[in-house]
């Protein structure tokens, strides 16, 4: 038994929540995952996380125009929230790979800009070009990271 989550954790907590409220929201997420998994189950998560940046530095453009009601987690919050439910087996930071992914997406968007504008309008296309440029810079300089976390279910968690 296993669970795979790609881009889920960014949508568990809202930007305006306090750190305590965010940890509680992540704890609820991990609690549900724990219940869904059979004993000995595994979970793999891919998520953007804060790197060398504070929550206060998070782009209001991304927070309001691209992913409203979303926020990147901090690794420490995820570790705290999963405590005694999951053992963290591995964490890998692939921010450089995701920088390349965002560059490829932006290149494809530019190459197909006319078709994209016809489909969703110039405002939406411009917004996503700006978003992808923000991401390319953020992943390049390490203000945001893309991590892959492997976790094993703790079958008899202590209260």
Ranges and model annotations:
Residues 43-44:
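A short hydrophobic/small-residue beta-strand
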């Amino acid at each position: 038994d296993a669970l795979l989550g790609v881009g889920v954790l960014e949508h568990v907590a809202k930007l305006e929540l306090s750190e305590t409220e965010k940890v509680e929201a992540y704890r609820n997420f991990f609690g549900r995952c724990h219940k869904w998994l059979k004993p000995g189950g595994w979970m793999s998560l891919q998520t953007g996380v804060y790197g060398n940046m504070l929550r206060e530095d998070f782009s209001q453009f991304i927070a309001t125009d691209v992913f409203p009601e979303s926020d990147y987690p901090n690794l420490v919050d995820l570790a705290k929230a999963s405590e005694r439910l999951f053992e963290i087996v591995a964490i890998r930071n692939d921010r450089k790979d995701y920088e390349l992914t965002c560059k490829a997406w932006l290149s494809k968007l530019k190459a197909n800009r006319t078709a994209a504008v016809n489909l969703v309008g110039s405002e939406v296309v411009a917004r996503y070009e700006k978003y992808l440029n923000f991401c390319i810079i953020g992943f390049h300089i390490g203000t945001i990271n893309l991590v892959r976390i492997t976790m094993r279910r703790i079958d008899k968690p202590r209260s």
